[in-house]
Amino acid sequence: MRSRVLVLLAAFALAGCMAAPDPSRPGVLTVGLREPATLLPADVTDQAGRLVTSALWTPLADYDAASGKLTPRAASSITSADRVHWTVKLAPGRFHDGTPVTAQSYVDTWAAVAAEHWASSAVLTNLLRAKEITAADPSTISITLDRPSGQVPALLSAPGLVPLPASVLASHDWNGFARAPVGNGPFRLNGAWQPGSGGTLQRDDGRGVTQIDLKVGDPAAQYDAVKAGTLDVATEVPGSRHESVDADFAGRHATWALPRAGYLVFPVADGRFSDATVRHGFALGVDRSALEAGALDHQAEPAKALLPPADAPGERTGTCRPCSFDAAAGKALLAQVAFPGGATVYFGPGTETWARPLTVGLHKSLDVSVTAQGKPATNALDGPSTLDVKLATPSPYELLSALATASGYADDVFRENLAAADAAATPDEAGQLYRLAENQLLRDLPVAPIWSAHGHAVWSARAHGVTTTPFAGITLAAITL
């Protein structure tokens, strides 16, 4: 009798393991993501943080780097007659606490961003460079620059420049606000964010899904949950699932360019790397495809240009020569200038995982002694260093100027082209000048492009209308069930 009971219990247990998941709740979307580093929008640099804050906030505008097209969002218009004096007209809007979004909201928020030195502060201090920002009236922001610039629409579309409510601007309780953020976007956070667990987004305008349950977890487990039908969207595809995604989710997965890229920066002031021939030799010795499949875990593409797709003014034809892997040519270039051999590649925070295998690859392909070492607290390096750039805006000016600064590259023609692109009257004119500046960097090669990051998501059969953008990732407000 006892054995029959055990058999029955085992049968029931097996049936429970094999049972289909509970039916999904109507109107509720479930989304898996990593733990965001912060939900303070001006300090967000990670993909998970941008996904959440892009649902909680609406930026002034969307800017497409490839076409130069500006789509007003929280602003009704962004205009200038001389590219020095800019006027931003706001569309009517409210924060989730019911208070109005005004021009003063932006003025005070931007002052706080600059004062707190958050990740997006450089957009204001280094790129916008305004002499004065004022609220002309409750719905009008007036900006006066220190020079003519046509890049203002691209800069003001930065997701880190969204407004904060008066309550936190008065209290300065930034940590508390990051746990329970209040934005001006289509979704509000229902309660506080629960670290390690997630949170619930609520939409009250009657459009799209009314509720999104955000679930923090492991990307591989989330991928498998979508496949099993217990999760609607997984916002990251780990390398271990890369090869099976087409078979598992035919027509229900997407990749998109992220505003992030990796570079090898050369110390152009150092005698051994002052010759561009040496720098080109090292660039040709990098097996980018091996890095992509190995250390980068299929989360990036081998670089094809200096400007990554998320930041480029249109598509570049073909792969740039320094982006190619040609070990024989690289060795020949080093032999041509009698490179003495022996080099250290320095890595900073967050780049060691790919810097070490890159160094091993250079040693093998170029047949010179190359070692990896943590970057010391000095600007005077005697070897190349790895650089992981996380962009705050879709303007190429941000990246090109940052790369020149990182390498110590100083050239009058490059500076003139960059300044002319910044001042250009139209996106087309600016794009041509940015390409000239990019081509010059590819010729002189103070930095070698290594990889550009991409996002990759999968979704269940009941999710529809999934679209993506470089900075927000998946547009949660566009999904329907």
Language-model segment annotations:
Residues 298-337, 353:
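Structural transition elements
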Residues 269-311, 354, 441-446:
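Periplasmic-binding protein-like
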